[in-house]
Amino acid sequence: MLLPLALLLGGCVSQPAPMSPKVTVGGSVGGVSLQARQAQLRLRLYAVVQGRMQTIAERRYRVSGLPLRYAFDLEVDRLEGEALYLRTELSWVGVAAVQASAWQQVAAGVDERVRLVRRDCFPNCTAARPEERSGND
């Protein structure tokens, strides 16, 4: 009777794995008037690892005004790459075509300012750009 009770009370002892240190890649997105329309903002963070771009994080926001504050809280070991880049795309809700975008190098711990650049067809873009149709990142 005491043996099962001793086993039950003894149980297993484990220690939690040490927390990996985190860094923040963040800032604000602006540069385009939304003209009282609902928009979708897609941010993708890339790391260059051994000469190849790899998506390491992605965020989507539904917005009715800019600027928008964003942040990616990442474990340090995910930032093994040589450089970080942020691709930002704005499209209207219900319209898949990108209306404005930005592509820039970013750094952890820096308050980045992303300025969207309008496409020539802004605000009435309806067709996807070639890179959007093929799905290449």
From Swiss-Prot:
<comment type="function">
    <text>Involved in the synthesis of the type III secretion system (T3SS), also called injectisome, which is used to inject bacterial effector proteins into eukaryotic host cells. Pilot protein that is required for the proper localization of the secretin PscC in the outer membrane. Necessary for full in vivo virulence.</text>
</comment>
<dbReference type="Pfam" id="PF09619">
    <property type="entry name" value="YscW"/>
</dbReference>
<keyword id="KW-0472">Membrane</keyword>
<protein>
    <recommendedName>
        <fullName>Type 3 secretion system pilotin</fullName>
    </recommendedName>
</protein>
<feature type="signal peptide">
    <location>
        <begin position="1"/>
        <end position="14"/>
    </location>
</feature>
<keyword id="KW-0998">Cell outer membrane</keyword>
<keyword id="KW-0732">Signal</keyword>
<keyword id="KW-0843">Virulence</keyword>
<comment type="similarity">
    <text>Belongs to the ExsB/YscW family.</text>
</comment>
<dbReference type="InterPro" id="IPR053740">
    <property type="entry name" value="T3SS_Pilotin"/>
</dbReference>
<dbReference type="InterPro" id="IPR039366">
    <property type="entry name" value="Pilotin"/>
</dbReference>
<dbReference type="GO" id="GO:0009279">
    <property type="term" value="C:cell outer membrane"/>
</dbReference>
